[in-house]
Regions:
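Conserved catalytic-core motifs of GNAT/GCN5-like acyltransferases
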Residues: 134, 152-166
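Conserved GNAT acetyl-CoA-binding A-motif
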Residues: 124-134
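GNAT-family acyltransferases
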Residues: 1-110, 121, 125, 160-193
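Conserved beta-strand-loop-alpha-helix junction that forms the acyl-donor binding cleft
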Residues: 133-143
Length: 193
């Protein structure tokens, strides 16, 4: 476990983030639906076996990644996932990503609430100074969602990650602890808190 960020369960209103377990494989297998919706996200699990493998990989090195199941508290369903990764306690930084949701909750308050919980925990409880987001440069939906959180676009990282048979150019976004108070207030207004 990351001693710095820990693995606390985080909750607000309709959303609970709790650490994944392998027992979540069946529920996770129902999240993706049409894999074409996730063409920019390599390796999304589409059945119970690939979900189990995905969860095992997500849990393999908890000092570098903390994977959360996103639960919709209105019905208790697992509706997606999000993670801290590239955790660097020495520099008080981490990335937020490995995020995907079932189609029925996309465009709702689920994602902004989940991201608010991760950012609040990192900045306010753990003293983070910088959080970053990475996405494929052509993933317009993800880029718009990250920008709406209040993160600043910092540039493109060429040949940053493998992507299929080639390489991905990554759009890099970041938020610092100096940015957080304003972003927090806008996010709380957005999610109705």
């Amino acid at each position: 476990m990351s001693a710095w960020l820990g693995t606390a369960t985080l909750a607000l209103g309709r959303v609970t983030l709790r650490p994944f377990t392998v027992d979540d494989a069946e529920a996770l297998s129902e999240v993706v639906g049409d894999p074409e919706r996730f063409r920019w996200v390599p390796g999304v699990p589409t059945d119970v076996s690939s979900s189990r493998t995905w969860i095992e990989a997500a849990l393999a090195d908890p000092s570098r990644r903390i994977a959360y199941a996103v639960v919709d508290n209105t019905d208790g369903r697992l509706v997606g996932t999000t993670s801290y990764y590239d955790i660097d306690p020495g520099n008080l930084t981490a990335a937020i990503g490995y995020t995907f949701y079932t189609e029925s909750v996309q465009g709702t308050a689920i994602n902004p609430t989940a991201k608010y919980l991760l950012m609040r925990h990192a900045f306010e409880d753990c003293g983070a100074v910088r959080l970053v987001w990475h996405t494929h440069e052509s993933n317009a939906q993800s880029r718009a969602a990250i920008a709406k959180l209040g993160a600043t676009f910092e540039g493109l990282l060429r040949k940053h990650r493998r992507f299929g048979e080639g390489w991905r150019t990554t759009a890099l976004y970041a938020m610092t602890d100096d940015d957080w108070p304003g972003a927090r207030d806008r996010l709380l207004a957005r999610i109705g808190r």
